[in-house]
Amino acid sequence: MHFCENRAADSVVGYYCALAKRENIPYSVQIDLPECLPVDEINLCLVLSNLLENALEASLRTAPARRRIKLTAYLHGNSLALIQVENTYDGVIREKDGVFLSSKRKGDGVGLQSVRHIAEKSCGVSTVTYQDGLFCVKVMLCG
């Protein structure tokens, strides 16, 4: 499957699409990223990987009838990349002092902290919302 012109991002998205498909998780993608990006390609792929990995893991712990992952990613203007990943979840989201705690082990979750750090390093931002069984992460990376 081909999702976008940027080969690195396309590979990441395709990998997680294949995993979701294998697990029968509905996976929606709206992505428009050109071959050449105004933002760091490695950082963009790290953000995509972290968010999609988290979404896949949360979906696997969600009742099969409610599972879904939705990815939206595109450029805004000449220097911003906007990424949003939504997924359903069952259970309790654990957060302490603005830091999400890992659902896999004791302590902080590394993935979302990494995403926040990458966004801030590029003078961007990341936000997380969760309500009524829907978890949403929005990331803005600046070039």
Describe every region a protein language model picked out:
Residues 91-93, 131-138:
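Glycine-rich nucleotide-binding loop
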Residues 78-109:
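Glycine-rich/acidic phosphate-handling loop/turn and adjacent ATP-lid/helix
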Residues 41-64:
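Conserved ATP-binding N-box helix of the HATPase_c
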Residues 5, 28-47:
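Conserved short strand/loop->alpha-helix "switch" segment adjacent to the catalytic nucleotide/phosphoryl-transfer site
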Residues 5-23:
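Short beta-to-alpha transition helix within the HATPase_c
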Residues 122-133:
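Glycine-rich ATP-binding loops of the HATPase_c
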Residues 66-79:
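Short beta-strand/loop element within the Bergerat-fold HATPase_c
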